[in-house]
Amino acid sequence: MKKFLTVVLAAVVISAGQLSAQRGQLLAGAAKSDVTPSAETLPKTSYGILDHCYARAIVFGNGATKAAFVSFDAAMMNQRLVDAVNERAEKELGIPSGNIMYNWTHTHSGATVPYDQLVELTYKAVKEAAESMVPAKVGYGNGVSYLNVKRDLFDPERGTWWEGPDYDGKSDKTVAVIYFESLDGKPIGTYFNYAMHAVISGNLDMVSGDFPGAASRYVESRYGDDFVAIFAAGAAGDQNPIYFQQTFDLRDIRIADYAKRGEDISNKMPPGGVGMDRNNPEVARLMGEQKQMVESYGQLLGEEVKYVIMMMRRFVTDVTISCHHKTLSVPGRRQLNGGGRAGYQGEYEDIGPVTIDMHLTMLDDIPVVGTSGEPYNPIAVRLKKESPYARTMLTMLCQGTFTGYIPDDESYVAQSFEVLGSKFKQGYAESAMVNAALDMIHDAVHANAE
């Protein structure tokens, strides 16, 4: 009972939001900016640019208020960037501060221009999207893709927990798609959500949007130069690409190479491709396959997005728009020991409360919930099951403050790097997040009903 009370109080007491109860004709526009750094500005450790990274924006309104989805082909959030763009968007475009849902695709190979330039390019995308708004309609659909898999695995050969494809593990295959189109049938943009880590190109040490960037480009190529396809990472804290053998093989090669030099990295993870012999023909072959896999994953996911759009039959033109926020405070912990990447018993001490930021953008009957951390997949599945709206989705790495991995309660038994390093005590965060999301949806619905 004590845990339950802590969660409920945390979710209810600290909240803020922007609500609009009015229904009106949907307006929508979209734009994007190339935020790839120039080759000459890349660090010496970089091997160049594999593909370009973008800031993408879809702005929508209903005559009473405006809101937006903004995504970045990058790994982590930036609160300064969010604050700077929000300030200008509210002052110059009339988008209320807090009505923009930002998400980072979490590509582990992303790179962007310097901060000041990134602010300008991001705002440029938002501004151009706002200026291109036209009367529109919106549709929603769900598809499926079997590209993801639970990545926390008890390895019988190692006799311990490790990272690998758990084919029997919990893994939501849903591809959730929001699609905007003008009243005369011109495609405007799409926001699609799928739970899978963007880690295919991580060993290459090249700038890349990984599979999210490839999927977005693939979908955009179908609908024209002005079309914008935003990838939103679902609850992928424990989800990897199912076909990931190139990375596993490269790890084994790197472990063996380090061992020859007298260093044991069998339970460590050097960043990127550090320490790999790129003159080794096998390394070169595997890295070449990784480059192909980026495009393959993007194409296959993009095909499902296109199919879902093609099969949409019902659209709405008059919509309500509600945005709401909560900051949760839940019991935290600090790890006291370290035994490598995985496969050992963690030791912890209690610390003060730690926070999780939650956001809701509710477009008519489509609740898009965002969180600042990397939640495990079962948290999103539970939210969708308990939500009164079938079109509910959960996007991770939203807004500007990163809060780390958030395992579901059941998964704390795993001695995986995500669970070991999590700063959230078992038994609190999962319910706090689900209840906060349901509270925000309730508040949005009641605001629209008044």
Segments and roles (model prediction):
Residues 1-4:
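Positively charged n-region of N-terminal signal peptides that target proteins for export
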Residues 22-450:
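Conserved beta-alpha junction segments in alpha/beta enzyme cores
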Residues 6-16:
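Bacterial N-terminal signal peptides
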Residues 17-21:
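Sec/Tat signal peptide C-region and signal peptidase I cleavage site
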